[in-house]
Amino acid sequence: MTLCLVSALVFGAFSSVSFGVAASGLPRHKYSSGKQQEQSVALPRTSYDIALALDFDKRTFTGSEQLHWFNKDDQATSVLYFHLYANVRGDDNSNNNNPREVSSNSGSSGGSEIQATPVPDEPRTDVTEVRDAATNAPLAFFLDDRATTLRVNLREPVAAGTGIDVLINFTGSVPEIGPDETGLLAHVLGQVDAALRRTRELRRARDINFRSRGVMLLGSAYPVLAARTGGDWRRKVEPSIGDMLYTDVADYHVRIEAPNDMAIFTSAAERRSENSGHSEQAASSKALDTKAVNSSASTSSIAHEFTGEDLRNFAFVAGRNLRSMERAVGKVQVRAVYMAEHETVARRALAAAADAVRVFTARFGEMPYKTISVVDAPLVAGLGCAEFAGFGVIASAFYVDFDAPAMRNLPELIREQRASVEDSLEWTVAHTVAHQWWGEVVGNDPERAPVLDEALANWSALAYYQEAHGETRAAAALDDQLRGVYRIYRTFGGEDLTAVRAAREYRNFFQYAAIVTSKGALMFAALRRQMGDEKFFAALRDYYAENRFEIAELNDLRDAFFAKTAPAEKRQLARTFSRWLAEKHGDEDIAPPDPRLAESLGVNTNTAKSGDQQQQRNKFARLGKFFWQQMTRIR
């Protein structure tokens, strides 16, 4: 999965801002299913065959998956590692390195059972059984890092050039998130608070695994095989302010049983749906433990089958009030999924998504996914969008219809923010669609090199504005969405930092957005000015083609640009990369703190003592609460 982790509405009184979701020298990882294999011999592919029975009303599911994994390395391995991302908790002490061997499950012939400790208002995934698919023999499995890493001990090592099939049965649940956490006011005040706070923030599993306002999002509900780097597994999940999901591509066949009044939209294409009240029908998925899964499915359920190739993850939304509309753009079907009451805004989102696919296809290269969906869902405050393969989720807080009757009774002060709100939605749609190129098709390690997807996706949104709306609108978007984020961050006392830090080194959403997604994006604008359009876009197209379905590194990006640069200009190109990523020239290159804005808000731009900081927060909170409490009437 790739996430656009943070997107915010901080506009009107001071700016229009949309925040998106590193180090060089990472080991090369070039063995998945991309260009390199096309030049030699295509190797067997990793594949998931998953079956889920969804109990929407109870917020639970029962599942089974059969994973086929082929060992492409030159060494045998006797252990498989999976990540249970739903069990990640958003605090520094919640995931440690102490492994725990769990007791034998007497009901599964010596297998082991792992259960995550139940936590109120958090999702969870519990593994109940692991078996060798070829022999049906139980496999010992263990829990590391507080239920976030599943370690499976194989009975025999998997030799280089051979594969194995493993069966995993699991159950899970998701929390109910209240509307007070997902509305426009929550998003705005959350970003105001982040701008002023000094405490550390981390992403939580509930951000992408929840039910709210009649919509359920399952972004990481199943055990995900850990990525391999340098011949070893990436074993530990590192909670941070950035994207926690780091995966290789795989093929997916997924069967979801759900109530027959439930609409389901996923990362993959739907093959068929059928009534499913009998175990014989459920058995069409070879991964399915029919007894386990059908126990959660009602006789009035429908089984939906989905298939997809070269997906980095599989996510889906479900709900009784979900609708969809589509538009063809070349070979890609662009789809908007939305809550029925948001149809008017969803049409605008679909138009922007279709234009973005058109622009990015022409500039970067063909999109291999047949469908790209833009999904309206009530994401929690601080998370404006979340991306998965072929599937981008945008916070419902952006779906504000200013022509609705309810808007007529609002003060002019509120209605005059229309352009800012609508621009924020369009920018977020373009950013979300861009992640299909940068983060999904071309993968990267979001913990070590977040600039490769977040910064590039944010710059791509600017490129979309230039081609869809012209230079005047693009210049305004650059100032509001890129320079403006950094300027406000510095005005509120934030420190200029290098953009090649690991995601966990950024303190909160606001800092991450200012340094990675905004400052990093402006580097690409500088490179384009320096190289010219022809060489710049040729470099991006080569980078995309060379790293398709693989895990790219910062050196891969640099190499693509150096390859299009004359020898006499390479030193200057190196300086540009270094200046924007490894050095701190933000005030000079972007914008310094704005003293007039600070004075008008009663904010001291200097790093404040704790007492002064609290006073500053109170001053701004009074303004923010008054202004944005009016905005809640829109919802």
What is the predicted function of each stretch?
Residues 53, 57, 306, 546-635:
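Beta/coil-rich, acidic/histidine-enriched accessory regions frequently appended to metallopeptidases
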Residues 2-16:
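Bacterial N-terminal signal peptides
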Residues 62-88, 93, 107:
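Ligand-binding face of N-terminal immunoglobulin V-set domains in extracellular IgSF glycoproteins
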Residues 423, 454-530, 580-588, 593-605:
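Acidic/His/Gly-enriched intrinsically disordered linker/tail segments
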Residues 107-129, 142, 166-317:
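Extended, low-hydrophobicity, Ser/Thr/Pro/Gly-biased non-transmembrane segments
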Residues 16-62:
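N-terminal, polar/Ser/Thr-rich
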Residues 342, 366-368, 447, 472-473, ...:
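Amphipathic alpha-helical substructures
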Residues 254, 305, 322-436, 440-449, ...:
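Juxtacatalytic substrate-recognition/specificity segment
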